[in-house]
Amino acid sequence: MSRPGREHVILDRIRGTVPPEFADDAVRLYRTILAISCSRQRIRILNAKLDRRVALCGIKHCGKTRLGNALAKTLGLPFFDTDALLETDAGKPVRAIYKEVGETKFRELEAETVRKFIASAPSPAVVALGGGMVSNPVLTPDDLHALGMIVWMDVPVPTAFERMAREGLPPFLADKPDPSVEFNRICAVRRPVFRAAADAVLELPEVLPVEEAIDRLLTVLESKVISK
């Protein structure tokens, strides 16, 4: 019997067993328990197959840290953020580093941090990559491959810019006559780089609750890990 057929039989038995006034509540409870059970089984299977780090890349403020942290908690894995690691190494915020040393030196420092991470970090794990890290000229394709399975979070540019504007524009945009135009230009340059580097793409054309975004991300990972 198919799964839908089995579920139909079980629901009929529930409705036939409990008092009519409690039948709808009993059915809802059954479906909640079933959903939790399926979710746990899904995570167990993915954990058993996942043998690499999951590295989330994408434009600045696409939600890598938020979603990466949530994914790590869902899978019971450690979480890292390359910007946070760089801040720890330098002893100051990423924006301050960039403003003080300029982009060329910033990319060199970023590459040092990433290579140190590759050499020492556990695997599997989840890591959020800095917005420009995939296009860092100091890093090689081998460096990117060593980070893990790269998943590109493809979000609309206006969504990311709106989030960034709320927090305050970074140095590379703050002095531009039209920051939104410059951000669009940067994103247009980086999109093909993200696509070329990515092992998988997570498309997020609309703003979603984190639970729904995680569900989509799990589906993407399953397509790459379980089917191989």
Residues of each region from the PLM?
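Short glycine-rich anion-binding loops that position phosphate/pyrophosphate groups of nucleotides
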Residues: 130-134, 156-158, 207
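Pre-Walker A (Motif I) flank of P-loop NTPase domains
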Residues: 50-54, 122-124
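Domain-level signature for soluble enzymes in the chorismate/prephenate branch of the shikimate pathway
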Residues: 1-49
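A glycine- and Lys/Arg-enriched "phosphate-lid" helix/loop adjacent to the NTP-binding pocket
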Residues: 146-191
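P-loop (Walker A) phosphate-binding loop of NTP-binding proteins
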Residues: 59
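ATP-dependent small-molecule kinase phosphotransfer cores
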Residues: 82-142, 169
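Walker A/P-loop
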Residues: 65
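NTP-dependent small-molecule kinase module
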Residues: 54, 70, 74, 145, ...
